Design a protein with these regions (language model features):
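Beta-strand elements of repeat-based all-beta scaffolds
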Residues: 1-65, 69-145, 150-183
Length: 183
C-alpha cells in the first residue's frame, strides 16, 4: 500500500507515530488498508485492518481491530450516513440485511427503518449493534445502543439541536440559543 506517516513530537521527543497504508480498492479508489500506531519510539503495531470498503465512495464496510474483533458498518441515506455499527460480526453476517436497510433509509418512514434496525439487532444476538437514524439536511435523529435503549434528538424550527432525550423521555442535554442585538 501507499503509506501516510504522521509523527508527533514535543520538545524534540517523539511521543508517537501513526501510519495509514492506502490501497487501490478498484476503479482508482484509494482508501485505507491498515492503520498502525506506536507510542514513543516503539515499533509500529497494526491496530486496524480494513477488510472491505465500499468501492463507490471508500466508506469502511468491515474492519478488524487489534485482537481480531470484526466491526461492520452499514451506510444509508444514499450511503452518506452510518446507520448501523455492528461489533463482533463479519460482512457475511450482515450482508443479507444491508440492501434492505439501505433502501428503507432512503424512504420517508423513519419508524419502519427503526423497526428494521431493531430486527438486525435481534438477528445477531452475539453482536453489539448500535444504530442511527437521521433527519435529512438537519442531523441525527436517533441513536440506539446495543441494549436497545434509544436516545432521540430534537431540533428547533431553525434546524438547531434543542435537546436530547433518553429512552424514558428524560432530557439528557438541552441547548438554548441567545442572540445579541447589533448596534
Amino acid at each position: 500500500g501507499i503509506p501516510l506517516i504522521t509523527e508527533t513530537y514535543k520538545n524534540g521527543i517523539k511521543l508517537g507515530a501513526q501510519e495509514t497504508s492506502f490501497k487501490d480498492w478498484g476503479g482508482g479508489l484509494l482508501a485505507p488498508e491498515f492503520i498502525k500506531t506506536s507510542k514513543g519510539t516503539t515499533p509500529l503495531e497494526t491496530r486496524v485492518i480494513y477488510n472491505k470498503v465500499d468501492p463507490s465512495n471508500g466508506n469502511p464496510i468491515e474492519v478488524q481491530k487489534e485482537g481480531g474483533i470484526h466491526i461492520c458498518y452499514i451506510w444509508g441515506y444514499n450511503k452518506t450516513q452510518l446507520i448501523a455499527k455492528i461489533e463482533n460480526a463479519t460482512y457475511n453476517d450482515i450482508q443479507p440485511f444491508e440492501a434492505n436497510l439501505q433502501a428503507l433509509s432512503n424512504g420517508t418512514n423513519e419508524q419502519v427503518l427503526i423497526t428494521a434496525l431493531n430486527n438486525l439487532r435481534t438477528a445477531l444476538p452475539n453482536a453489539m449493534v448500535t444504530t442511527y437514524t437521521y433527519k435529512p439536511l438537519i442531523g441525527i435523529s436517533t441513536v440506539t445502543d446495543p441494549k436497545g435503549d434509544m436516545q432521540t434528538y430534537h431540533y428547533d424550527g431553525f434546524g438547531r439541536l434543542q435537546f436530547v432525550k433518553d429512552a424514558q423521555g428524560n432530557i439528557l442535554s438541552e441547548n438554548q440559543y441567545h442572540y445579541r442585538t447589533q448596534n
